[in-house]
């Protein structure tokens, strides 16, 4: 009799769509996947980009989850579906929503179905600037510094600021709201059939990095601190949590309703949801001393360190350090850039404007712009006098968060070409990446090697070679387009009891590497001088 083959589902909720990946638990091989776009988001409903408002309806998540799982399983057949033994997730973060006492996001109630402030507030929403300032001002005066493990600054992208902003805009929401839930916690709660705010499992990853949760002060900030920000937040504190769980935990079993909706057997293990970049780092094979760069529209940089290495030290100016947020038993560090690929897309739109407005060009012509710019930029000579840009078009996430700073270009002449400007923008994003690496090293976080995942890492040799030359170390690209979903499947494998630890699952299931970029040290010497100009342009020298 052949031994039973076990399969796992890793579900990756991105900014625009959800991806379901079917994985063989024995070796991580990918059987099938399906990607389903969020239908309302695709129509740009409930968003106001001019005011940095980005909202997603909870039905987008529910409908797309159901469709993606069913499509992926249909590509495998019934035998595979019946042999799935675990499912886990990653989502963007902080992407929270206000809920009622049952844990239902308020946008699922008829009276708030079209109210953007009742929906999930997407990670890149920057409407809560004033509320973040209030939290930071109070934290600097409070006896306990609740931002200590958040890099010293609480961001407008994080849950307390976002929920406070929504509560203050609508008296109706303020009266109806009982608690809040992060996207990743809501999905796992849905699947086990219990969304009660006081009892659902809460992810250590998102709680520690986005909600100022830390064991040293008993979990979330004290009720008195939250009440001083707004009395309702203090009340919410009693409807939330003190304990959290790491990504390897099983939060429960798939309930009958959701088993039927997804086409799975009831009772399979449901894992803990966590932040996409952290889960992607697991899928990449992160170990202590490895920096994983998750490279897409923005970036996220993930490192893990041992307790002996880190001790009581805190790293200033990053997005947090949390015990067990990536690998259980290790400190997880998060940093990142607010715009990376988005910066290249912005310049493409600038270049395409006359084509659209005057020539009425074919959209396929616009798609060629970055490819042509890249080809020409690769041929340009590299000199210390080249134009230099700042990559802060969407503010600065790290080092030292400041959403109000803006991008810049320096050193332009009448001879500066479009490819030269594009080259400067690529270099600026990579200089921003180097600044993060240097901050980690300055603060005593060991980094021995760099791995890269994400669309840019897989698709842009120009950007990756520039990064290797600027940073001056080799960079290996992980051989999977779906590292986040694969990392979620690894967590599902541990939750289902197939492996005794995340590291054991990684050893069996990690995909290896597809490319390695080695630095050109002659170019690195020139980039050192350009990097110094970048730092001076941003007032950081």
Describe each region flagged by the PLM.
Residues 130-133, 279-283, 338-341, 345-348, ...:
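Glycine-rich phosphate-binding/hydrolytic loop that grips phosphoryl groups
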Residues 379-479:
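Activation-segment/catalytic-loop signature of the eukaryotic protein kinase fold
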Residues 157, 335, 343-345, 350-359, ...:
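Acidic, glycine/GT-rich loop-and beta-edge segments that sit at the periphery of enzyme/chaperone cores
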Residues 78-158:
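Active-site phosphate-binding/coordination module
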Residues 158, 212-328, 355-356, 361-375, ...:
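ATP-dependent carbohydrate kinase catalytic cores
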Residues 65-75, 257, 285, 421-448, ...:
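Phosphate/ATP-binding catalytic cores across multiple sugar-kinase/actin-like superfamilies
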Residues 1-108, 235, 260, 264-269, ...:
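N-terminal glycine/serine-rich phosphate-binding loop of ATP-dependent small-molecule kinases
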Residues 13-15, 139-272, 390-394, 422, ...:
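Gly/Ser/Thr-rich active-site cleft segment
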């Amino acid at each position: 009799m052949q031994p039973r083959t076990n399969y796992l589902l890793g579900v990756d909720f991105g900014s625009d769509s959800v991806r379901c990946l079917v994985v063989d638990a024995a070796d991580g091989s990918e059987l099938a996947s399906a990607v389903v776009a969020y239908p309302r988001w695709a129509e740009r409903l409930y968003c106001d980009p001019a005011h940095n408002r980005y909202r997603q309806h909870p039905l987008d998540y529910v409908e797309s989850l159901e469709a993606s799982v069913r499509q992926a399983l249909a590509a495998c057949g019934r035998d595979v579906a019946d042999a799935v033994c675990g499912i886990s997730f990653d989502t963007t973060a902080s992407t929270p929503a206000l809920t009622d006492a049952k844990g239902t996001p308020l946008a699922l109630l008829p009276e708030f179905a079209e109210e953007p402030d009742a929906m999930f507030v997407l990670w890149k929403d920057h409407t809560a600037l004033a509320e973040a300032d209030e939290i930071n001002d109070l934290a600097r005066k409070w006896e306990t510094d609740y931002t200590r493990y958040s890099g010293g600054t609480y961001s407008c992208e994080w849950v307390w600021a976002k929920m406070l902003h929504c509560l203050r805009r609508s008296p109706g929401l303020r009266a109806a709201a009982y608690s809040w839930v992060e996207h990743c916690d809501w999905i796992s709660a849905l699947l086990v059939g219990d969304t009660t705010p006081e009892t659902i499992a809460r992810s250590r990853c998102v709680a520690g990095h986005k909600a100022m949760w830390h064991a040293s002060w008993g979990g979330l900030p004290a009720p008195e601190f939250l009440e001083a920000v707004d009395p309702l937040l203090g009340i919410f504190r009693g409807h939330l949590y003190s304990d959290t769980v790491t990504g390897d935990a099983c939060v429960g079993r798939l309930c009958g309703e959701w088993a039927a909706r997804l086409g799975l057997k009831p009772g399979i293990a449901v894992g803990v949801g966590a932040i996409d970049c952290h889960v992607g780092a697991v899928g990449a094979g992160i170990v202590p001393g490895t920096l994983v760069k998750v490279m897409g529209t923005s970036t996220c940089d993930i490192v893990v360190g041992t307790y002996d290495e880190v001790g009581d030290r805190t790293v200033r100016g990053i997005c947090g350090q949390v015990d067990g947020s990536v690998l259980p038993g290790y400190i997880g560090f998060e940093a990142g850039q607010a715009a990376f690929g988005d910066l290249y897309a912005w310049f493409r739109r600038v270049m395409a404007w006359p084509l659209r407005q005057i020539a009425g060009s074919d959209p396929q012509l616009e798609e060629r712009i970055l490819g042509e710019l890249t080809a020409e930029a690769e041929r340009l000579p590299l000199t210390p006098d080249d134009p230099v840009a700042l990559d802060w078009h969407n503010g600065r996430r790290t080092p030292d968060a400041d959403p109000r700073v803006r991008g810049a270009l320096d050193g332009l002449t009448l001879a500066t070409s479009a490819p030269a400007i594009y080259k400067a923008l690529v270099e600026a994003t990579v200089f921003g990446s180097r600044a993060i690496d240097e901050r980690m090293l300055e603060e005593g976080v060991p980094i021995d090697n760099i791995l890269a995942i994400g669309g840019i890492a897989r698709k842009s040799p120009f950007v990756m070679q520039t990064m290797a030359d600027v940073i001056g170390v080799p960079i290996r690209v992980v051989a999977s387009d779906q590292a986040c979903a694969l990392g979620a499947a690894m967590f599902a494998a541990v939750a289902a009891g197939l492996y005794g630890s995340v590291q054991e699952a990684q050893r069996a299931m990690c995909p290896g590497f597809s490319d390695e970029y080695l630095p050109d040290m002659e170019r690195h010497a020139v980039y050192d001088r350009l990097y110094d100009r970048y730092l001076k342009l941003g007032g950081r020298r």
